[in-house]
Amino acid sequence: MSALDDSIRVEVKTEYIEQQSSPEDQKYLFSYTITIVNLGEQAAKLETRHWIITDANGKITEVQGAGVVGETPTIPPNTAYQYTSGTVLDTPLGIMYGTYGMVSESGERFKATIKPFRLALPGLLH
């Protein structure tokens, strides 16, 4: 674990996209808006993403790749980077979590943690 691991805060907002979902076909589309806040003293570049997505049936999908939404943003100190993406589940409920592979301005590699967050149809959970 690097001292830089805590320099990035990840905030998440999710939304069920009813118009593009098809419950009768077990296709539930969710969007998620991620805000990555650099609380550190140096710029940090997001190089990779690693997601683990689990639906209510326990089906696990792992997603790894370069950057996010086609970008590898450099986030200056005390600023934030925001993007929106999406995922399709076979069930109306699931969770996602993961990490971003980051590199600091000084070249140190570290992981930014994306804490588990819920994907759920509105009104499904009380």
UniProtKB/Swiss-Prot annotation:
The gene is apaG. Transmembrane segments: none annotated. InterPro entries: ApaG_domain (IPR007474), ApaG_sf (IPR036767), Uncharacterised_ApaG (IPR023065). This is Protein ApaG. Disulfide bonds: none annotated. It comes from the Bacteria. Residues 2-126 form the ApaG domain. GO terms for biological process: error-free translesion synthesis.
